[in-house]
Regions:
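Short beta-strand micro-motifs within the conserved protein kinase catalytic domain, predominantly
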Residues: 55-68
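Conserved kinase catalytic-core helix
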Residues: 81-116
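The N-lobe alphaC helix and its flanking beta3-alphaC-beta4 segment of protein kinase-like domains
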Residues: 34-49
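Pre-DFG segment of protein kinase catalytic domains
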Residues: 170-171
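Conserved short submotifs of the Hanks-type protein kinase catalytic core
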Residues: 65-78
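Juxta-kinase regulatory segment immediately upstream of eukaryotic protein kinase catalytic domains
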Residues: 1-3
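An alpha-helical support segment within catalytic cores of ATP-dependent transferases
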Residues: 107-154, 158-165
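ATP-binding glycine-rich loop module of kinase domains
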Residues: 10-36
């Protein structure tokens, strides 16, 4: 990583830096490399279906560290969360934009994205605190839900939405 970087956010197992014209997410050794590559693949797939988002540019192993980095394009702008905080009088307007973006995203399909149904099934199966009957009932409910290939952002919140300098919203 270059010395001229600005830390944007630090969460759990990652730190996000601004490199000027690019953004890099640096994951520590607790993040499986397969998850880092999967995030890059998901970015590519949502780009291909037309959702406004930064393009993945590179995945690389960190030098002198046990971790990985995902480099993406930088979308010039401000997060929706920052705008909501800075301009509380416009909170309702920003919230409406946020909801409209979620509706827009749900209008896209991407059959190659990992299916949330499969993820939830794995999660239900791993809940040792629940007895087998309860897990079975949850799986039955999950199986009864509509099967679609609509895009659903797994962590959709205003801090993950950028209001671009062009006025468009990006995820």
């Amino acid at each position: 990583l270059p010395d001229s970087k600005t830390e944007l956010v630090r969460r759990g197992n990652k730190v996000v830096y601004d490199l000027g014209d690019k953004i890099v997410k640096v994951f520590n050794e607790t993040k499986p490399v397969s998850d880092v590559f999967n995030e890059a693949l998901n970015l590519a797939r949502i780009n291909e279906c037309g959702i406004r988002s930064p393009k993945a540019l590179e995945v690389s192993q960190l030098e002198n560290a046990n971790g990985w980095a995902l480099v993406t394009e930088k979308v010039p702008g401000t997060t929706l969360a920052e705008k909501m905080t800075a301009e509380p009088q416009r909170f309702g307007e920003y919230l409406e934009m946020f909801v409209d973006l979620q509706i827009e995203i749900h209008g896209y399909t991407s059959p190659l994205l990992n299916r949330q149904r499969d993820k939830y099934a794995r999660m239900i199966d791993s809940l040792d605190q629940l007895n087998a009957t309860t897990r079975y009932n949850l799986q039955e409910r999950l199986d009864g839900m509509t099967k679609e290939f609509k895009v659903c952002h797994g962590d959709f919140n205003p801090s993950n939405v950028i209001v671009g300098d062009d006025g468009q919203l990006y995820v």
